[in-house]
Curated annotation (Swiss-Prot):
Residues annotated for substrate binding in this entry: N202, P203, P204, Y205
HAMAP family: RF_methyltr_PrmC
Catalytic activity: L-glutaminyl-[peptide chain release factor] + S-adenosyl-L-methionine = N(5)-methyl-L-glutaminyl-[peptide chain release factor] + S-adenosyl-L-homocysteine + H(+)
Name of this chain's protein: Release factor glutamine methyltransferase
MF term (GO), any: nucleic acid binding
Claim: Transferase is one of the keywords in the record: yes
Entry keywords, A to Z: Methyltransferase, S-adenosyl-L-methionine, Transferase
Lineage of the species this protein comes from: Bacteria, Pseudomonadati, Chlorobiota, Chlorobiia, Chlorobiales
Cited InterPro entries: DNA_methylase_N6_adenine_CS, HemK-like, N5-glutamine_MTase, PrmC_N, RF_methyltr_PrmC, SAM-dependent_MTases_sf, Small_mtfrase_dom
Family: Belongs to the protein N5-glutamine methyltransferase family. PrmC subfamily.
Record-linked Pfam families: MTS, PrmC_N
């Protein structure tokens, strides 16, 4: 019986990237790197620093199993159990959304607005993250603003379990208060407390009518609860109503947006907010909206 070929890291990456590309897998290089890094316990950069490292038969079988899952459509981040956001590594599974690069831009915009208001230089700015999911926004804010006190709210107890795990991993658990609360509930403001210097939210904003148009792997694997609202605007409306009582005067409200949502969300804000700004993503689509409480 012929011996199994001994694969090096670089050979296996090259072959897998080409195979994934042939099979029309999104981001074939990223998929191959994340899966192989997961199997070997290496960061993506380390794969290339240790490119001649041979794989054991056990490692090769584990990598093949991971590739089979990817070919079936399961997102690579769920297979590897990790995703990167703003340069930080987060644990993810099907209980939470996979962090997106567009959300990094919204977070950066929120921090810029907070800095412009002067509130980021306070001894301990108070921040509320509504719909925290994996905790990537709340935890990144805690890491970037070491004096910040953060409240992270989500309606999903399962999502909060993931967020707590990530907060523990990044050493910020003592500065983040996790709250199970529904932003659509009249009791939401009482549940989360306040007042806050920054309220940031990436709420469910996909209208029910658009659900069938999303990528199949999103519909099959990512939590619908975190993505969809009947018209796409219910959470914006509820948060906009609650925000004046949650934010200090001059406090910043920052939303991630549906690409077509800026005008409607602006209308929902009413007269309680000033200096409304809309920011665009890498594709020049409206992606974030921020304003200040009056």
């Amino acid at each position: 019986m012929p011996e199994e070929k001994v694969w090096s890291v670089v050979e296996l990456l090259k072959t897998t990237i080409a195979f994934f590309a042939e099979k029309k897998i999104d981001e074939p290089r990223l998929s191959a790197e994340l899966l192989l890094g997961h199997v070997l316990g290496l960061q993506r950069l380390q794969l290339y620093l240790d490119h001649e490292r041979p794989l054991t038969l056990k490692e090769l079988e584990a990598f093949r199993a991971a590739c089979r899952e990817r070919l079936q459509g399961r997102p690579v981040q769920y297979i590897a159990g990790e995703a990167f956001f703003y340069g930080y590594q987060f644990f993810v599974d099907e209980r939470v959304l996979i962090p997106r690069p567009e959300t990094e831009l919204v977070l950066e915009h929120a921090m810029e607005r907070l800095a412009a208001s002067g509130l980021d230089s306070a001894d301990s700015p108070s921040i509320l993250d509504v719909g925290t999911g994996s905790g990537c926004i709340a935890i990144t804010l805690a890491l970037r603003l070491p004096g910040a006190r953060v409240t992270a709210a989500d309606v999903s107890a399962d999502a909060l379990d993931v967020a707590r795990r990530n907060a523990d991993a990044h050493g910020v658990s003592e500065r983040i208060r996790f709250v199970e609360a529904d932003a659509l509930s009249a009791s939401f403001a009482d549940a989360v407390g306040g007042p806050f210097d920054l309220l940031v939210s990436n709420p469910p904003y996909i209208p029910e009518a658009e659900w069938a148009t999303l990528q199949e792997e999103v519909r099959r694997y990512e939590p619908r609860l975190a993505l969809v609202a009947p018209t796409g605007f219910e959470y914006y409306q509820s948060i906009a109503v609650a925000a004046p009582s949650l934010l200090r005067k001059g406090g910043v409200l920052c939303f991630e947006l549906h690409a077509d949502g800026a005008a409607e969300v602006r209308n929902l804000l009413g007269s309680s907010f000033a200096d409304v700004q809309v920011m665009q993503d890498y594709n020049k689509l409206d992606r974030g909206l921020s304003c200040m409480a009056q």
